[in-house]
Amino acid sequence: MPTKAKVAIVGSGNISTDLLYKLLRSDWLEPRWMVGIDPQSEGLARARKLGLETTHEGVDWLLAQPEKPDLVFEATSAYVHRDAAPKYEAAGIRAIDLTPAAVGPAVIPPANLRQHLDAPNVNMITCGGQATIPIVFAVSRVVEVPYAEIVASVASVSAGPGTRANIDEFTKTTSRGVETIGGAKRGKAIIILNPADPPMIMRDTIFCAIPEDADRDAIAQSIHDVVKEVQTYVPGYRLLNEPQFDEPSLNSGGQAVVTTFVEVEGAGDYLPPYAGNLDIMTAAATKVGEEIAKETLATTAGGAQ
């Protein structure tokens, strides 16, 4: 019986390379292939040195191989994944999508991972979503949250051309996730590209409107519990200080507010530690892949008995 799921990484850029190092440490995932389109790609060269089979001939090469992966992690672009996703599904390959394509349901591990373990395709939403939606979820599971607003500040040098070209998509997708996964009735997302040099690590502020008579101790405890859960796969995720509670005011629209400040320091596997915004995407994707693999391997083992 196999003890690890066979994995292909589609894409050979910075995120794919950082993801590779995380997958190599996994007890549940075995990276076997890296697929790119540039024969001179540094990511493909690194993957070859680490023992993976590589190609610059794209997804069609992977799908033509006699042995197929169980899981594909795709870190290319939205239009590439939208084209490839039906091919993966037809081949019986599960897909974890790190692009904005959103073909399948969006997943935030502490909030809704268990609901989508059998989905053929899951989407990792955005870096801002992975960092902030867990906090909104932590509050909304204790009290009603009529409005939540998140502000994600990331080092400008960590934002590549894809992020810059899709700022509007980032804010819309993250805002929607604050509502549909975080549990807020209305959500808003803002991203700031911080030009500071030396670069600052990712910092996020999460505002949640709450009832005036809310149990503040229960909310604070729920936030701490979720932070600990995120730290199991992103050790550099931490609260900057205790959640801050404010009474209703004109500035808050007459509602009480809890404000949470977090920062995300990357593990430094391939990307620099200040790029916590990218690290949390690869770490969360690895976590999702591991849980899918555990579930799949357990089901396979049960069926074999």
UniProtKB/Swiss-Prot annotation:
GO molecular function: acetaldehyde dehydrogenase (acetylating) activity; NAD binding
Family: Belongs to the acetaldehyde dehydrogenase family.
Binding residue positions for NAD(+): S12, G13, N14, I15, S158, A159, G160, P161, G162, T163, R164, A165, N166, N277
Gene Ontology annotations of biological process type: catabolic process
Keyword Oxidoreductase tagged: yes
Pfam families on file: AcetDehyd-dimer (PF09290)
Superkingdom of origin organism: Bacteria
Organism: Mycolicibacterium paratuberculosis (strain ATCC BAA-968 / K-10)
EC number, as in UniProt: 1.2.1.10
HAMAP family with a match to the protein in the record: Ac_ald_DH_ac
Catalytic residues (UniProt): C127 (acyl-thioester intermediate)
SMART domains to which the protein is assigned, alphabetical: Semialdhyde_dh
Keywords assigned: Aromatic hydrocarbons catabolism, NAD, Oxidoreductase
Enzyme class: oxidoreductase
Reaction catalyzed: acetaldehyde + NAD(+) + CoA = acetyl-CoA + NADH + H(+)
Protein name (Swiss-Prot/TrEMBL): Acetaldehyde dehydrogenase
InterPro entries xrefs: Acetaldehyde_dehydrogenase, Acetylaldehyde_DH_C, NAD(P)-bd_dom_sf, Semialdehyde_DH_NAD-bd
